[in-house]
Protein backbone atom coordinates (compact mmCIF):
# COMPACT_ATOMS: atom_id res chain seq x y z
CA UNK A 1 0.00 0.00 0.00
CA UNK A 2 2.85 2.39 0.80
CA UNK A 3 4.35 2.09 -2.67
CA UNK A 4 0.95 2.63 -4.33
CA UNK A 5 0.48 5.82 -2.31
CA UNK A 6 3.91 6.91 -3.52
CA UNK A 7 2.85 6.44 -7.16
CA UNK A 8 -0.23 8.62 -6.63
CA UNK A 9 1.76 11.27 -4.76
CA UNK A 10 4.53 11.42 -7.38
CA UNK A 11 2.44 11.36 -10.56
CA UNK A 12 -0.69 13.26 -9.55
CA UNK A 13 -1.62 16.44 -7.70
CA UNK A 14 -3.79 14.54 -5.22
CA UNK A 15 -2.84 15.16 -1.59
CA UNK A 16 -1.67 11.83 -0.20
CA UNK A 17 -0.81 12.01 3.45
CA UNK A 18 2.19 10.07 4.70
CA UNK A 19 3.44 9.11 1.24
CA UNK A 20 7.15 8.32 1.03
CA UNK A 21 9.40 8.07 -2.01
CA UNK A 22 9.06 4.45 -3.10
CA UNK A 23 9.32 3.22 -6.69
CA UNK A 24 8.85 -0.47 -5.91
CA UNK A 25 5.33 -0.26 -7.41
CA UNK A 26 6.30 1.83 -10.43
CA UNK A 27 4.67 -0.84 -12.61
CA UNK A 28 1.29 0.48 -11.40
CA UNK A 29 1.87 3.98 -12.76
CA UNK A 30 -0.14 3.58 -16.01
CA UNK A 31 -3.01 1.78 -14.31
CA UNK A 32 -3.30 3.86 -11.14
CA UNK A 33 -2.02 7.35 -11.89
CA UNK A 34 -2.96 7.01 -15.55
CA UNK A 35 -6.58 6.22 -14.73
CA UNK A 36 -6.77 9.11 -12.25
CA UNK A 37 -5.19 11.74 -14.49
CA UNK A 38 -6.85 10.49 -17.66
CA UNK A 39 -10.13 10.19 -15.81
CA UNK A 40 -9.96 13.86 -14.86
CA UNK A 41 -9.49 14.87 -18.48
CA UNK A 42 -12.15 12.45 -19.67
CA UNK A 43 -14.69 13.69 -17.14
CA UNK A 44 -14.16 17.31 -18.17
CA UNK A 45 -14.46 16.41 -21.85
CA UNK A 46 -17.66 14.45 -21.17
CA UNK A 47 -19.18 17.46 -19.39
CA UNK A 48 -17.91 20.29 -21.61
CA UNK A 49 -17.00 18.72 -24.98
CA UNK A 50 -14.03 21.12 -24.91
CA UNK A 51 -10.63 19.61 -25.81
CA UNK A 52 -8.85 22.64 -24.33
CA UNK A 53 -10.64 22.29 -20.99
CA UNK A 54 -10.04 18.54 -20.95
CA UNK A 55 -6.33 18.90 -21.65
CA UNK A 56 -6.03 21.64 -19.03
CA UNK A 57 -7.65 19.26 -16.54
CA UNK A 58 -5.05 16.61 -17.42
CA UNK A 59 -2.24 19.06 -16.77
CA UNK A 60 -3.71 20.27 -13.49
CA UNK A 61 -4.24 16.68 -12.35
CA UNK A 62 -0.47 16.15 -12.65
CA UNK A 63 0.30 19.38 -10.79
CA UNK A 64 2.04 20.64 -13.96
CA UNK A 65 5.02 18.58 -12.84
CA UNK A 66 5.80 16.99 -16.20
CA UNK A 67 5.04 20.18 -18.11
CA UNK A 68 7.83 21.83 -16.15
CA UNK A 69 10.16 19.07 -17.34
CA UNK A 70 9.14 19.75 -20.93
CA UNK A 71 9.96 23.44 -20.51
CA UNK A 72 13.37 22.59 -19.04
CA UNK A 73 14.18 20.22 -21.91
CA UNK A 74 12.98 22.78 -24.45
CA UNK A 75 15.47 25.29 -23.07
CA UNK A 76 18.27 22.70 -22.91
CA UNK A 77 17.81 21.76 -26.56
CA UNK A 78 18.57 25.35 -27.53
CA UNK A 79 22.11 25.00 -26.12
CA UNK A 80 24.67 23.12 -28.21
CA UNK A 81 27.23 22.35 -25.51
CA UNK A 82 26.23 19.26 -23.50
CA UNK A 83 27.47 20.45 -20.11
CA UNK A 84 25.79 23.83 -20.53
CA UNK A 85 22.60 22.11 -21.65
CA UNK A 86 22.59 20.03 -18.48
CA UNK A 87 23.05 23.15 -16.38
CA UNK A 88 20.14 24.80 -18.18
CA UNK A 89 17.92 21.94 -16.98
CA UNK A 90 18.53 23.09 -13.42
CA UNK A 91 17.89 26.78 -14.17
CA UNK A 92 14.42 27.84 -12.93
CA UNK A 93 14.30 30.72 -15.42
CA UNK A 94 12.39 30.15 -18.65
CA UNK A 95 13.91 30.74 -22.07
CA UNK A 96 12.33 30.92 -25.49
CA UNK A 97 12.83 27.19 -26.12
CA UNK A 98 10.88 26.18 -23.03
CA UNK A 99 8.08 28.65 -23.65
CA UNK A 100 7.75 27.56 -27.28
CA UNK A 101 7.67 23.87 -26.32
CA UNK A 102 4.90 24.37 -23.76
CA UNK A 103 2.76 26.61 -25.98
CA UNK A 104 3.17 24.39 -29.05
CA UNK A 105 2.25 21.26 -27.13
CA UNK A 106 -0.78 22.87 -25.53
CA UNK A 107 -2.05 24.12 -28.89
CA UNK A 108 -1.52 20.66 -30.42
CA UNK A 109 -3.34 18.77 -27.67
CA UNK A 110 -6.04 21.37 -27.00
CA UNK A 111 -7.05 21.49 -30.66
CA UNK A 112 -7.37 17.70 -30.97
CA UNK A 113 -10.93 16.41 -30.74
CA UNK A 114 -10.89 12.69 -29.89
CA UNK A 115 -13.72 10.26 -30.61
CA UNK A 116 -14.70 9.78 -26.99
CA UNK A 117 -13.97 10.95 -23.47
CA UNK A 118 -12.43 7.50 -22.95
CA UNK A 119 -9.57 8.50 -25.26
CA UNK A 120 -8.24 10.79 -22.53
CA UNK A 121 -7.91 7.81 -20.22
CA UNK A 122 -6.28 5.71 -22.93
CA UNK A 123 -3.80 8.43 -23.84
CA UNK A 124 -2.64 8.74 -20.25
CA UNK A 125 -2.34 4.97 -19.87
CA UNK A 126 -0.32 4.92 -23.08
CA UNK A 127 1.98 7.84 -22.28
CA UNK A 128 2.91 6.52 -18.86
CA UNK A 129 3.38 2.98 -20.15
CA UNK A 130 5.66 4.14 -22.96
CA UNK A 131 7.72 6.23 -20.54
CA UNK A 132 8.13 3.19 -18.29
CA UNK A 133 9.39 1.02 -21.16
CA UNK A 134 11.70 3.73 -22.52
CA UNK A 135 13.12 4.39 -19.05
CA UNK A 136 14.06 0.72 -18.75
CA UNK A 137 16.40 1.08 -21.72
CA UNK A 138 17.86 4.43 -20.67
CA UNK A 139 20.89 5.45 -18.66
CA UNK A 140 20.74 8.38 -16.23
CA UNK A 141 23.36 11.09 -16.57
CA UNK A 142 22.97 12.10 -12.90
CA UNK A 143 21.67 10.76 -9.62
CA UNK A 144 18.20 11.82 -8.59
CA UNK A 145 14.53 10.90 -8.87
CA UNK A 146 15.00 10.15 -12.56
CA UNK A 147 17.76 7.63 -11.90
CA UNK A 148 15.67 5.91 -9.21
CA UNK A 149 12.77 5.67 -11.66
CA UNK A 150 15.05 4.21 -14.34
CA UNK A 151 16.50 1.58 -12.00
CA UNK A 152 13.02 0.49 -10.92
CA UNK A 153 11.72 0.50 -14.51
CA UNK A 154 14.43 -1.95 -15.61
CA UNK A 155 12.82 -4.61 -13.42
CA UNK A 156 9.15 -3.72 -13.88
CA UNK A 157 8.68 -2.51 -17.47
CA UNK A 158 6.90 -5.69 -18.75
CA UNK A 159 3.89 -4.71 -16.64
CA UNK A 160 3.38 -1.72 -18.96
CA UNK A 161 2.84 -3.85 -22.07
CA UNK A 162 -0.92 -4.43 -21.55
CA UNK A 163 -1.49 -0.66 -21.45
CA UNK A 164 0.43 -0.25 -24.70
CA UNK A 165 -1.59 -3.09 -26.23
CA UNK A 166 -4.87 -1.35 -25.35
CA UNK A 167 -3.74 1.90 -26.99
CA UNK A 168 -2.54 0.02 -30.09
CA UNK A 169 -5.74 -2.01 -30.38
CA UNK A 170 -8.07 0.99 -30.11
CA UNK A 171 -6.19 3.31 -32.46
CA UNK A 172 -3.43 1.41 -34.31
CA UNK A 173 -2.49 4.19 -36.74
CA UNK A 174 -2.39 6.81 -33.98
CA UNK A 175 -0.39 4.47 -31.76
CA UNK A 176 2.22 3.86 -34.45
CA UNK A 177 2.55 7.52 -35.42
CA UNK A 178 2.66 8.83 -31.85
CA UNK A 179 5.19 6.19 -30.79
CA UNK A 180 7.55 6.88 -33.70
CA UNK A 181 7.40 10.66 -33.24
CA UNK A 182 7.76 10.44 -29.46
CA UNK A 183 10.78 8.15 -29.71
CA UNK A 184 12.34 10.46 -32.29
CA UNK A 185 12.02 13.36 -29.83
CA UNK A 186 13.34 11.28 -26.93
CA UNK A 187 16.34 9.85 -28.76
CA UNK A 188 17.34 13.29 -30.06
CA UNK A 189 17.14 14.83 -26.58
CA UNK A 190 18.79 11.79 -24.98
CA UNK A 191 21.79 12.04 -27.31
CA UNK A 192 21.99 15.79 -26.82
CA UNK A 193 22.09 15.45 -23.03
CA UNK A 194 24.13 12.25 -22.93
CA UNK A 195 21.51 10.37 -20.94
CA UNK A 196 18.19 10.79 -19.21
CA UNK A 197 16.88 12.42 -16.06
CA UNK A 198 13.47 13.14 -14.56
CA UNK A 199 12.95 16.22 -16.71
CA UNK A 200 13.46 14.29 -19.95
CA UNK A 201 11.17 11.45 -18.89
CA UNK A 202 8.54 13.98 -17.84
CA UNK A 203 8.88 15.73 -21.19
CA UNK A 204 8.40 12.38 -22.93
CA UNK A 205 5.17 11.87 -21.00
CA UNK A 206 3.80 15.22 -22.17
CA UNK A 207 4.94 14.85 -25.77
CA UNK A 208 3.53 11.32 -26.07
CA UNK A 209 0.19 12.30 -24.58
CA UNK A 210 -0.27 15.29 -26.90
CA UNK A 211 0.84 13.36 -29.98
CA UNK A 212 -1.53 10.49 -29.27
CA UNK A 213 -4.49 12.84 -28.87
CA UNK A 214 -3.57 14.67 -32.08
CA UNK A 215 -3.01 11.51 -34.12
CA UNK A 216 -6.24 9.94 -32.86
CA UNK A 217 -8.08 13.02 -34.12
CA UNK A 218 -6.23 12.98 -37.45
CA UNK A 219 -6.61 9.25 -38.11
CA UNK A 220 -10.30 9.33 -37.20
CA UNK A 221 -10.91 12.25 -39.55
CA UNK A 222 -9.10 10.49 -42.38
CA UNK A 223 -11.03 7.26 -41.89
CA UNK A 224 -14.36 9.09 -41.72
CA UNK A 225 -13.43 11.00 -44.86
CA UNK A 226 -12.69 7.81 -46.75
CA UNK A 227 -15.76 5.91 -45.63
Curated annotation (Swiss-Prot):
GO terms for biological process: cobalamin biosynthetic process. Signal peptide: none annotated. Its EC number is 2.7.8.26. The chain crosses the membrane at residues 3-23, 26-46, 95-115, 117-137, 165-185. One of its GO terms (molecular function) is cobalamin 5'-phosphate synthase activity. Its cofactor is Mg(2+). Pathway: Cofactor biosynthesis; adenosylcobalamin biosynthesis; adenosylcobalamin from cob(II)yrinate a,c-diamide: step 7/7. It is found in: Cell membrane. It is a multi-pass membrane protein. It catalyses: alpha-ribazole + adenosylcob(III)inamide-GDP = adenosylcob(III)alamin + GMP + H(+); alpha-ribazole 5'-phosphate + adenosylcob(III)inamide-GDP = adenosylcob(III)alamin 5'-phosphate + GMP + H(+). One of its GO terms (cellular component) is plasma membrane. It comes from the Archaea. InterPro entries: CobS. Keywords: Cell membrane, Cobalamin biosynthesis, Magnesium, Membrane, Transferase, Transmembrane, Transmembrane helix. HAMAP family: CobS. Joins adenosylcobinamide-GDP and alpha-ribazole to generate adenosylcobalamin (Ado-cobalamin). Also synthesizes adenosylcobalamin 5'-phosphate from adenosylcobinamide-GDP and alpha-ribazole 5'-phosphate. Belongs to the CobS family. This is Adenosylcobinamide-GDP ribazoletransferase. It comes from Pyrobaculum islandicum (strain DSM 4184 / JCM 9189 / GEO3).
Amino acid sequence: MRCLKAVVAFFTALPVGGAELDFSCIWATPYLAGLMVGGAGGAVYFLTHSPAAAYAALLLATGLHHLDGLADVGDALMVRDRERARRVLEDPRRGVGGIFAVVALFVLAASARPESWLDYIVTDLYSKALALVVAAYSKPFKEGLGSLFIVSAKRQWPAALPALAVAAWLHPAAFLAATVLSLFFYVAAYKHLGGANGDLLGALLEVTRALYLATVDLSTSLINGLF
